[in-house]
Amino acid sequence: MALNLRKNHQILKIINDALIDLPAPSNISTWWNFGSLLGICLITQIVTGLLLAMHYTADTNLAFSSVAHMCRDVQFGWLIRNLHANGASFFFICIYLHIGRGLYYGSYLNKETWNVGVILLLTLMATAFVGYVLPWGQMSFWGATVITNLFSAIPYIGQTLVEWAWGGFSVDNPTLTRFFALHFLLPFVIVGLTLVHLTFLHETGSNNPLGIPSDCDKIPFHPYYTIKDILGFALMLSLLVSLALFAPNLLGDPENFTPANPLVTPPHIKPEWYFLFAYAILRSIPNKLGGVLALAASILVLFLTPLLHTSKLRSMTFRPLSQILFWTLVANVLILTWVGSQPVEHPFIIIGQLASLTYFTIILILFPLAAALENKLLKL
């Protein structure tokens, strides 16, 4: 019998078991495509980021000019930069949809996979934040100043911690240098965590839209889901390229076309769109430490979802009350995103506070209550 290299070679065997002969549920929908799309986003970001890093200079006097030089003088530098900047937006679109899928279908009951996923989200947010500082425009500088300053709310050690992170008494050259180092390093940490995430996932196998065990009805990953993933790649990459070519600055802030100036504060300091929901929660509490705790809680609350699952059914497919709550939560996050982009004025303050309260109420109180009620109604 001829030796099958794919199944016997030490390294190829790992790839084979993860991408070719992997038993997958026969009924997973397009919502299960976002994991592989996140993988493509990560590869795209690392490749474009590496090419950008070859031309970038991490110095306060040269950073802004080096980015301008890239866009003007480097072959296709403008395209590489636009793909990288907008690739970050697609990364977050995919991860938010991926998390939404996990919440809806009860995928969080694979606890290890879910917890590693939340750590991945936090790492991605850190990577995007330090990356946004690198072009050294006005919003880069002031965003870095405002967000790093939040750590000063930590009692007793806060101020020391902030000055240690800054490498001085304000955001300056040492800050930019270390942020570049971190922005280069963290994507590789994300790659490592992704492998851990996949390892845990392949221990249990994928969940499916019905939320029931699918061991009795599995199909090989290749060719069925490889072709399905390739369709997803084609759709997402065509959208990314369209955005990068037709409207590259649509999601950016015009303030970042002005070089960083510590003496001039922009009228509205706000992060990129993908952080606005958390920023709105931060702003809705009129106390620095309280705001920081709420900001942290807005993401860390995801760690609690497996513990708050009271339903006898895994998925929300057959749970209409939970479905209504879920879509209310989605609408609520969109409202928070919109409020975060608005100035701190009368209607927006109260809307932000109500939306922040609703966000935590739905996740921590209403989801478990609705699930318990549904158990009763369905006589489970």
From Swiss-Prot:
Its main localization is mitochondrion
GO annotation (BP), single? mitochondrial electron transport, ubiquinol to cytochrome c
Q: Where does heme b b566 bind?
A: 98, 197
**Record-linked Gene3D superfamilies:** Cytochrome Bc1 Complex, Chain C (1.20.810.10)
What's in the keyword line of the UniProt record?
Electron transport, Heme, Iron, Membrane, Metal-binding, Mitochondrion, Mitochondrion inner membrane, Respiratory chain, Transmembrane, Transmembrane helix, Transport, Ubiquinone
Further remarks about this protein from its record = Heme 1 (or BL or b562) is low-potential and absorbs at about 562 nm, and heme 2 (or BH or b566) is high-potential and absorbs at about 566 nm.
Which protein are we looking at? Cytochrome b
Q: Which organism is it from?
A: Geothlypis trichas
Its gene is MT-CYB
